UniProtKB/Swiss-Prot annotation:
Protein name: Thiazole synthase
Catalysis: reaction(s): [ThiS sulfur-carrier protein]-C-terminal-Gly-aminoethanethioate + 2-iminoacetate + 1-deoxy-D-xylulose 5-phosphate = [ThiS sulfur-carrier protein]-C-terminal Gly-Gly + 2-[(2R,5Z)-2-carboxy-4-methylthiazol-5(2H)-ylidene]ethyl phosphate + 2 H2O + H(+)
Alphabetic keyword roster: Cytoplasm, Schiff base, Thiamine biosynthesis, Transferase
Root EC class: transferase
Source organism per UniProt: Campylobacter jejuni (strain RM1221)
Main location (coarse class): cytoplasm
Known EC number: 2.8.1.10
Amino acid sequence: MQEKLKNDKLKIGKYEFDSRFILGSGKYSLELIKSAIEEAKAQIITLALRRANTGEIANILDYIPKNITLLPNTSGARNAEEALRIARLSRELGCGELIKIEVISDSRYLLPDNYETIKACELLAKEGFTPLPYMHADLYAARAMRDAGAAAIMPLAAPIGSNKGLCAKEFIQILLNEIDLPIIVDAGIGSPSQACEAMQMGVSAVMVNTAIAEAKDIALMARAFSLAVNAGRAAFLAGLASVSEAKASSPLTGFLRD
């Protein structure tokens, strides 16, 4: 049992990780980032890279332990070309080739633009990046992103920052059935139980930001999510019992006599 869990690695392109919990950094005070990372036992942390905030980015990097893998995102990009420019900036800042593609042109619902994201995957892959596209769970778009060079697919569970949970559960399940890439649930997860449910489905990892950043005790909530992700993964590997009609767990005959 322990060996099975020990050998269970998250593989993204050429990278391997022991933790399947990815931590967002968008809403934390700088002082709390390090403690959240430690309690989450995360090995990957996302990082916004808008050109207007380069000074702030340098400060954030000072608070992230050196052994943590950075997953910069293209937050602020409204099209594929802007995503490429932000990705290039991230590489210039020394953040490596892993990049989370975020292309959002809708300021009301903040839904990712799948069409521009497909284009961004192709552009970034051609320049040697390892793209992880954030997307609205759609099979055709996911296939196109895979074919364009995506190393993993990051469908939203619910609108970003909403904490509504697995609203897109059925569509995420289709991606799990049909896409032979890591599926990382991103956006909308609001509680540890929801993260656990996602992992039980068989997703490769879960990314959480708002639900931890807005908790009363950020470090403790980060730990709660870490435990939930691990529990959900273990349940998936163990094999969940099928859902069915009522079945007696003990014999109902032969124990009462007239």
